[in-house]
Swiss-Prot record:
Domain of life: Eukaryota
Gene field: petN
KW Electron transport (keyword) present: yes
Gene Ontology biological process terms from the UniProt entry: cytochrome complex assembly; photosynthesis
Listed HAMAP family: Cytb6_f_PetN
Species: Cucumis sativus
Bilayer topology annotation: Single-pass membrane protein
Stated name of the protein: Cytochrome b6-f complex subunit 8
GO MF: electron transporter, transferring electrons within cytochrome b6/f complex of photosystem II activity
Predominant location: plastid
Subcellular location: Plastid, Chloroplast thylakoid membrane
Self-association state and partner proteins as the record states: The 4 large subunits of the cytochrome b6-f complex are cytochrome b6, subunit IV (17 kDa polypeptide, PetD), cytochrome f and the Rieske protein, while the 4 small subunits are PetG, PetL, PetM and PetN. The complex functions as a dimer.
Main function: Component of the cytochrome b6-f complex, which mediates electron transfer between photosystem II (PSII) and photosystem I (PSI), cyclic electron flow around PSI, and state transitions.
Length: 29
């Protein structure tokens, strides 16, 4: 796994995590 793939994977994980956090926060969970 090269650095570009690793960077993209990390970016997707952070984006998905923050997005789900916002959704859960608005749901009141």
């Amino acid at each position: 796994m090269d650095m570009v793939s690793l960077a993209w994977a990390a970016l997707m994980v952070v984006f998905t995590f923050s997005l789900s956090l916002v959704v859960w926060g608005r749901s009141g969970l």
